[in-house]
Amino acid sequence: MLFKLSPSSLNLMKECPRCFWLDKHNVWKRPSGIFPSLPSGMDKILKVHFNKFRDKGELPPELCNNKDCINLKLFDDKEKLKIWQNNLRGISWEDKEGNVLHGAVDNILVHGKKFIVLDYKTRGYPLKEDTAGHY
């Protein structure tokens, strides 16, 4: 059986393997939760902020002041990025067997020919020590 996997389906697999199996075999879909409007609003604000710097050909100060971001730039193909940022269209990769990884990106940094996907994390509480290990 071939699968189309997204970040949310992988989270479902981690949270509830049975729910994942039932979903992927079209038996039952777990009800969705309340839409997180505050994080969604922050996501839009961050995208507008990054686009201002993309238009100037610069990195935003949050990144240009980070030593790990030296020689990086924001992906500059606005039309392609708009598609990849859309949850319904996004970007996909298919393996040799036909399984698909699919999702939307928040932003992309470029280093030579390599792409680095940025995933904005918005939450209403301070980061914990082990937060980075979850990603």
Model-predicted segments: where are they?
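Nuclease catalytic cores
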Residues: 2-65
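Short N-terminal secondary-structure initiator segments
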Residues: 54-73, 114-116, 124-129
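A short acidic/basic microdomain associated with nuclease active sites
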Residues: 59-97
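Structured catalytic/translocation cores of nucleotide/phosphate-coupled proteins
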Residues: 1-12, 18-24, 99-103, 107-111, ...
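A generic structural signal for solvent-exposed, polar alpha-helical segments
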Residues: 26-27, 56, 81, 90, ...
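Mg2+/Mn2+-dependent nuclease catalytic core
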Residues: 85-86, 90-135
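Detector for Asparagine
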Residues: 11, 26, 51, 65-66, ...
